[in-house]
Amino acid sequence: MAPGAPSSSPSPILAALLFSSLVLSPVQAIVVYTDKEVHGAVGSQVTLYCSFWSSEWVSDDLSFTWRYQPEGGRDAISIFHYAKGQPYIDEVGTFKERIQWVGDPHRKDGSIVIHNLDYGDNGTFTCDVKNPPDIVGKTSQVTLYVFEKVPTRYGVVLGAVIGGVLGVVLLALLLFYLIRYCWLRRQAALQRRLSAMEKGKLHKTAKDASKRGRQTPVLYAMLDHSRSTKAASEKKTKGLGESRKDKK
């Protein structure tokens, strides 16, 4: 390289920006959701739900693919495909006349319904979603169990037991607080009654004392009057006796 010629190596700032754009920028993959398992009775129908999350807007090239692997089988076969706004049911397998498309791509829903269930339908169903340019991600699987009569799920029984226990506890607490409220109300009424009786006794005592206070001077006055009358009568009697002696 000739002296004074500009350097052809990238600047440190440009190298750092390139490194951050390639390494540090997050890579977001499409995420597919299904139930873990579903139960159905022979002759009934069951819905296999499938939804997804994507960092991109819903594309016109959005596609859903359902595959089925029989119970104990090794290979999975395609049973349903949705692309370009049209559902396609594969002509291979026993589901070709029993599958119904019930999904809504605008709501990111790729669900299907399987009608007229049979014991041979037991197996694993896989939902795969592509939303270009977001095409990288894992599929999701749901296992179908077909019974003569759908058994009550353990979670439902446990939930019912827990709900019953909580109901009994709440009822007991309500009854306790109701009894306590009635008892406190009765005690308050009794306390008010006793307080009123005490006030009545005090008022009566004060009234009697006031009455006795008013009667005492009258009694003393009557007693003095009686004494004065008696003294005057005795004096008069004594004077009459002395007068009779003088006449004799």
Curated annotation (Swiss-Prot):
Q: Which segments sit on the Extracellular face?
A: 29-155
What residues bear Phosphoserine in this entry? 210, 226, 228, 233, 243
Family in the record = Belongs to the myelin P0 protein family.
Processing after translation: N-glycosylated; contains sulfate-substituted glycan.
* Primary location recorded for the protein, binned into one broad class: membrane
Q: Where is the signal peptide?
A: 1-28
Compartments annotated for it: namely:
Cell membrane
| Entry keyword set | Cell membrane, Disulfide bond, Glycoprotein, Immunoglobulin domain, Membrane, Phosphoprotein, Signal, Transmembrane, Transmembrane helix
Does the keyword Phosphoprotein feature in the UniProt annotation? yes
Q: Report the SS bond pairs.
A: 50-127
Tissue expression pattern:
Found only in peripheral nervous system Schwann cells.
- Which SUPFAM superfamilies does this chain map to? Immunoglobulin
Explain the purpose of this protein.
Is an adhesion molecule necessary for normal myelination in the peripheral nervous system. It mediates adhesion between adjacent myelin wraps and ultimately drives myelin compaction.
Name of the protein this chain belongs to:
Myelin protein P0
Cite the residue spans of the region called Disordered.
Answer: 224-248
The record's Gene Ontology cellular component field reads: plasma membrane
Give the Ig-like V-type domain ranges. Answer: 30-143
Stretches assigned to the Cytoplasmic side: 177-248
